[in-house]
From Swiss-Prot:
This is D-aminoacyl-tRNA deacylase. A motif (Gly-cisPro motif, important for rejection of L-amino acids) lies at residues 136-137. An aminoacyl-tRNA editing enzyme that deacylates mischarged D-aminoacyl-tRNAs. Also deacylates mischarged glycyl-tRNA(Ala), protecting cells against glycine mischarging by AlaRS. Acts via tRNA-based rather than protein-based catalysis; rejects L-amino acids rather than detecting D-amino acids in the active site. By recycling D-aminoacyl-tRNA to D-amino acids and free tRNA molecules, this enzyme counteracts the toxicity associated with the formation of D-aminoacyl-tRNA entities in vivo and helps enforce protein L-homochirality. The gene is dtd. Keywords: Cytoplasm, Hydrolase, RNA-binding, tRNA-binding. A Gly-cisPro motif from one monomer fits into the active site of the other monomer to allow specific chiral rejection of L-amino acids. SUPFAM superfamilies: DTD-like. It comes from Vibrio vulnificus (strain YJ016). Homodimer.
Amino acid sequence: MIALIQRVSEAAVRVDGEVVGQIDKGLLVLLGVEKDDDEAKAKRLMERVTTYRVFEDSEGKMNLNVQQVDGKVLVVSQFTLPADTKKGTRAGFSRGAHPADAERLYDYFSDLCQQVLPTERGRFAADMKVSLINDGPVTFWLQV
C-alpha cells in the first residue's frame, strides 16, 4: 500500500463540478492499493501517515505531525501509484489491487484516519478534479 502525502494549506476534490471533500491545513493523501495489501497494511500505513513529522516546529524543523498541528486529512484513491513504469512508454497496472478489494481497503484506511483526526475523502473510481496548495512544497512517498 502506497501513500503519496503532500503538506497543504488547502486542498479539495470535485466530482462533476461538486466539491466532495475539502480541507484547509493538513495532508492530501493519494492512496494506491496493491494486490497483496490487507487491513494490517492499511492500519500500519494510517499510523505512519498520521504520525509522520512533516510540519515545522517553532525552530523551523519538521518535527510535528498532522495531529499536533490540528490538521486534517483528505484521502484520494490513486490507482496509478502502484503502476509498473520500469520499461517502455506506457505504465502497467498489474500490481494494483482488484477494484473491489481496493475500494474496501481505501474505505478502511479512510475510516481509520477518521478515528484519529478530521478526514475528508474523494469518491472511489470517480473522475476527480483535485486542487491543492502544496505548502513548501513538501511531498513524501510512504509504502508498507
